[in-house]
UniProtKB/Swiss-Prot annotation:
Disulfide bonds: none annotated. Homotrimer. Its EC number is 3.5.4.13. Pathway: Pyrimidine metabolism; dUMP biosynthesis; dUMP from dCTP (dUTP route): step 1/2. DCTP binds at K111, S112, T113, Y114, A115, R116, T135, L136, E137, Q156, Y170, Q180. The gene is dcd. The active site is at E137 (proton donor/acceptor). Catalyzes the deamination of dCTP to dUTP. This is dCTP deaminase.
Length: 188
């Protein structure tokens, strides 16, 4: 299994629709100033966070249960900046929609710019033949409020091509998050 380069990522995005919308180069400015970078890097693709957020709240005194998740655990927020409370958690989604080829495993990692501020993005795989917007999970590990910027870089995707095609893909087994759009809550 080998990691794929910027040339491969560009080709797959432009010819196969693997990433849409797609930035063929790393973007560091938005016309008004510096931003957290997004787009194609040497061996990965830095994704942007959309402006839809779900922020954890305890106002309803519910219990967090992955088998029986209560949507009242979150407050919905739309905006260019999301403030995550101290020692709390938020969900968002990528701007980009992904279509992962059958012979590729993609891994989502956090960007060091955010990690150095105590904001951690969950490491998660995008399995062969999965497609959709990626739901992103952010933990604010600090005792202070923390900012997440919409439409700027938030995480990096690494693409690994397998030596052989998998026998059963995410699509084949009817994966529960296949084709997700928007911020998707846990499912069983």
């Amino acid at each position: 299994m080998s990691i794929k380069s910027d040339k491969w990522i560009r080709r797959m995005a432009e010819q196969q629709g693997m990433i849409a919308p797609f930035a063929p180069e790393l973007v560091r400015h938005n016309g008004t100033g510096k931003i957290v970078s997004y787009g194609t890097s040497s061996y990965g693709y830095d994704v942007r966070c959309a402006n839809e957020f779900k922020i954890f709240t305890n106002i309803n005194s519910t219990i967090v249960d992955p088998k029986d998740f209560d949507a009242r655990n979150f407050v919905d927020f739309v905006g260019d900046v999301c403030i995550i409370p101290p020692n709390s958690f938020a969900l968002a989604r990528t701007v980009e929609y992904f279509r992962i080829p059958r012979n590729v495993l993609t891994v989502c990692l956090g960007k060091s710019t955010y990690a150095r501020c105590g904001i951690i993005v969950n490491v998660t795989p995008l399995e062969p033949e999965w497609e959709g917007h990626v739901t992103l999970e952010f933990s604010n590990t600090t005792p202070l409020p923390a900012k997440i910027y919409a439409n700027e870089g938030i995480a990096q995707m690494l693409f690994f091509e397998a030596d052989e095609v998998c026998e059963t893909s995410y699509k084949d087994r009817g994966g529960k998050y296949l084709g997700q759009t928007g911020v998707t809550l846990p499912k069983i």
